[in-house]
Amino acid sequence: MGGLGSAPLPPLGPEDHLLGADEDEPLIVYADYECPHCAVLHARLVRDGGSWAFRHFPVRSKHPRAWAAACAAEAAALQGAFRQMHMALYADRARLEDPHLWERARALGLDVERFDADRRSDAVLARVRRDFESGVRAGVVTTPTVFERGAMRPSAPDEM
């Protein structure tokens, strides 16, 4: 019988958000937009030009605004702007409340009414939940957690 961490890491699929350089075997990163360590890792990945798939792992007990931010990123994805929203959320982690999320959507040229409806939709909630649950099954307990070729790597940015 399986428990936490007993399932294999789900392989990359069409729902994954690939960021960075185009590589055959990108890292898989479970992260949270409010997590300071995730922000450090994100900056390092961007700076170093690596390739990674971003999966949502909002740790609500530590980061109460992370779930809303994850839903905002997925709502932007439905309008073809995941990467842009992802970058905007990490650029200003201190402002993850509704008015600021709407400002970001507007600045990205998104249909703000659709964005707001989408981020509260069952489909977006299910998408974020799928990422989170796949992380739990693969043994993720904190953020950031990085997998390389299916194996969990040290998560602290200075250990990578």
Language-model segments: which ranges?
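Detector for methionine-enriched segments
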Residues: M1, M85-M87, M152, M160
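N-proximal helix/coil linker or "cap" segments that precede and/or mark the start of modular domains
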Residues: M1-L9
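Sparse, context-dependent recognition of short Cys/His-centered cofactor- or disulfide-binding micro-motifs
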Residues: L4, G20-E23, F57, A70, ...
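A short beta-strand-turn-helix
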Residues: P8-E25
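Homeobox/homeodomain signature
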Residues: P8-L9, G80, H86, D118, ...
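Short clusters of hydrophobic/aromatic residues that line enzyme substrate/ligand-binding pockets
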Residues: L18-L19, L96, R153
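C-terminal cap of thioredoxin/glutaredoxin-like
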Residues: D24-A31, H37, H42-R47, E103-M160
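Structural alpha/beta surface segment adjacent to cysteine/selenocysteine redox centers
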Residues: E25-R106
